[in-house]
Structures are given as structure tokens and as C-alpha cells.
Swiss-Prot record:
EC number: 2.8.1.13
Record-annotated disulphide pairs: 121-218
Region of interest: Interaction with tRNA: 168-170, 330-331
Provenance organism: Haemophilus influenzae (strain ATCC 51907 / DSM 11121 / KW20 / Rd)
Protein's name in the database: tRNA-specific 2-thiouridylase MnmA
NCBIfam families named in the record: PRK00143.1 (NF001138), trmU (TIGR00420)
Localization: Cytoplasm
Function per UniProt: Catalyzes the 2-thiolation of uridine at the wobble position (U34) of tRNA, leading to the formation of s(2)U34.
Amino acid sequence: MLISNTYNQHFPQLTQEQLARNATKKVICGMSGGVDSSVSAFILQQQGYQVEGLFMKNWEEDDDTDYCTAAADLADAQAVCDKLGIKLHKINFAAEYWDNVFEHFLTEYKAGRTPNPDILCNKEIKFKAFLEYAAEDLGADYIATGHYVRRAGDNENAKLLRGLDPNKDQSYFLYTLSHKQVGQSLFPVGEIEKPIVRAIAEDLGLITAKKKDSTGICFIGERKFKDFLARYLPAQPGNIRTVDDEIIGRHDGLMYHTLGQRKGLGIGGLKNAGDEAWYVVDKDVENNELIVAQGHDHPRLFSKGLIASQLHWVDREPIRESLRCTVKTRYRQQDIPCVIEPIDDETIRVIFDEPQSAVTPGQSAVFYLGEVCLGGGIIAERI
């Protein structure tokens, strides 16, 4: 039996009764080949569960094999499972990913919006396709992932909470889950901080202990986003126009730019323009024009609120009365105090206490009451 002193210091010792109860439950742990899922599997073992791993392949390699880490990740996942003495299953969800995540991603970019495919991947793949496969084909009572979130309550009463580590909290990416999905899922590393996760992996001598966290969109990897997108969507160059209606340059394609962007606009050397940096403040999709203004505090960068649609509430009950809470309009943002005003069951108006910069249509607005993630929706427009 592998031993980790770090684990023993940070997790309570379970009673024999708790261990015996857990021993009747089978958990399929998603193994990505990273340190978080590796340590998650170990924690579940220590808590007495019957643990098996599952490696998901969600993207078929293309010509850029340098950028696709699937083979190396699978090898790492297998090495960890061998060390822990658990079985590793493998499944290919590439077709489901293409149909339910990637095509939506392209459609949104084509429409000039900035989607978040990781949120859609969690909704359609990790907590739908994976959950169904684990339960129906592998006989799982629960699935587990290496996400930094916590769960309170069971089954019908399950709530999604922020991860204990504020620097790693991933509840923003999981707001589309229902209370039933949360109730069927375990999040072992959500109860600890990232340095402790790495320390446990070091104690165990896991191959993933020092492995760098993956960054960026999973199907793009480390390659340049612009180069990748150009392979699937033909770029449509157009004018860069100022808020004062002056054309001052050309853009390569609206899809390559996002609200609040400062770098990479190629604007410079303009007479009477001053020294302040230029920022993207809007996209005119109809005329294929990028709208820019000078200064990080330009009024056009700010919104007093937003309209959100495609709503998902974790308890699946729509909000029908005004609610004071907090919101994040992008990952790792500080919570913004706000009031939700329902328009109908599918749409809400959100008014911030103070104007916010670079609120981006296509991104998600995720709402919180203290530690509890209530759910969220897609930003349809700025106010």
C-alpha cells in the first residue's frame, strides 16, 4: 500500500464504518495524465472506494503531432494506474466532441462571439458522455475528476461549491452541471490546495508529480490559436474603425480579436493620436469592422450590466425574483457584486454595482451566493 504523509496530515482518518460503506461503491476516475487526476485516484483509494481509471481521447491527432500530447498523456495515466494498482479503461469520444463541442465553437467564432469550449466540454463530454459510459458500461456508482470544486449534500440535494484553493477554483467551468450530475460526481482535490496535491504526488513518486499543468484550449494545445483557427474558418479581413468613425487600419478577421484586447492590433504612427494604447471596444459583425478606442478607461470599454441567455441553474429551478449575488464574467475574475433581474425563464438582466470592463458576448456569466455556485448563462449582450 502506498503511503503519503502529506495526505495523512490533510485528510481526516475515516472510521471503519465509513470505509466499509465506501468499499461497496465503485468510482471511475477520469485520468488525464495530469497530477490532479493522479492524486484524485489515490485519495479515493485511501477513502476505501473501489477505484478504476478511465482515459478519454476527445480529439483525433492531425498533422501537427508535435502539438498533440494524447499519446504521452495516456502513457502517464497508465504509469500512474500501474503504480496505484488500478485498472485503466480507455474510450474515444472524438466524434461526440466534434459534433457537440467543436462545431459549436466554430459557429460561435464565425458569428463574432468568443465561446469557451472548456465549459461545453464539461457539459457534453466529461459529465455527460463519460458519466453515462461509466455508469452504464462500467457499473460506476460515481465518477471522479481532478477539478478544483467541492460538493455539498448528496443526490437530489447536491450543491456545487467553489474549490478550497481560490487560485485554482474551477466552478466557473462547471456551472452547467445539474444537481444530479454533481451528486454522481466526486472531486477529491477540491478539498485541498494545489501545492498539497503536488506534495502528495511527490510522496508517492508519481510520474506526474512535476508535470506542468495543461493550459489553453485542449484541442489546440501549445500551437498558435490564430494558425489553428485559420485551418477551419477562412479569415475575412476588414477595417479597423475608431469610435469617432475614422478608419485607421485593417484587421485579419474579427474572430482573432476579443473585447478589451490591446496587443496585436497593428495600430501605430497615427498623427494626432496621442500615446495612449488602443483597445478593442466592439465588433461590428454586420460590416466586418473592429471598433477601437484609446485608453484603458475609455467609456466604451465598460458595461453597467449584461443580458444572459441559455441559462443553467445547478438546482434546475429558474430564478423568478430579483436576487442579489455575485458574478464572474470570465475565469479567475474577482467576484462582481450584482443583482439578477429575471426577464423570463430563459433570459436574465444582470446589473453590476459598478461598471465592468470588457464584458464579452459569447463568454459565460457565472453566479455565486457565497461559496455556492448557482449556475450561469451565456452573455448575449452588454448593457
